[in-house]
């Protein structure tokens, strides 16, 4: 996996920008723009401009983030995480503070979470 850039108003890749992620254990290629110069490519939060990993959600949660389409709402990324004990939880990652918080537990019969919709 790699991140390429297309500058505003352009139609071709910026030849001066390439962030090669070959040395990281990127899973599945799930990608989301988080705002504030950050992107999520499972399980990493990346500072795109500085080509730097700022968070590894697998390490921060102790599990495997598995949601294919995550929810980004009110400065947070919400993702489903499967723990080594095969329990599922929704985790909230605060983009600005670089912190995670464990939320609701998901029914143990669930085998995959593909999409998280707006939370109330």
Question: In which residue ranges do the predicted regions lie?
Answer:
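Acidic, serine/threonine- and glycine-rich low-complexity intrinsically disordered segments
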Residues: 1-43
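Beta-propeller blade signature
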Residues: 1-10, 45-52, 90-97
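Beta-propeller fold detector
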Residues: 8, 12-23, 51-62, 101-108
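Repeated scaffold domains used in trafficking and secretory/extracellular systems
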Residues: 20-36, 62-73, 108-120
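Conserved beta-propeller blade signature
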Residues: 39-40, 76-80
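Short, flexible beta-strand-to-coil junctions
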Residues: 43-44, 48, 80-85
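Outer membrane beta-barrel transmembrane domains
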Residues: 56, 65-67, 78
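Blade-level signature of beta-propeller repeat domains, shared across WD40, Kelch, NHL, RCC1
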Residues: 82-87, 96-120
């Amino acid at each position: 996996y790699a991140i390429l850039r297309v500058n505003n108003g352009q139609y071709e890749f910026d030849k001066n920008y390439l962030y090669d992620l070959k040395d990281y254990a990127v899973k599945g290629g799930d990608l989301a723009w988080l705002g504030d110069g950050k992107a999520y490519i499972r399980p990493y939060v990346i500072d795109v401009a500085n080509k730097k990993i700022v968070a590894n959600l697998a390490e921060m949660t102790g599990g495997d983030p598995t949601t294919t389409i995550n929810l980004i709402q009110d400065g947070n990324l919400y993702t489903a995480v499967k723990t080594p004990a095969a329990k599922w939880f929704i985790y909230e990652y605060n983009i600005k503070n670089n912190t995670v918080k464990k939320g609701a537990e998901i029914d143990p019969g669930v085998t995959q979470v593909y999409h998280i919709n707006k939370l109330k």
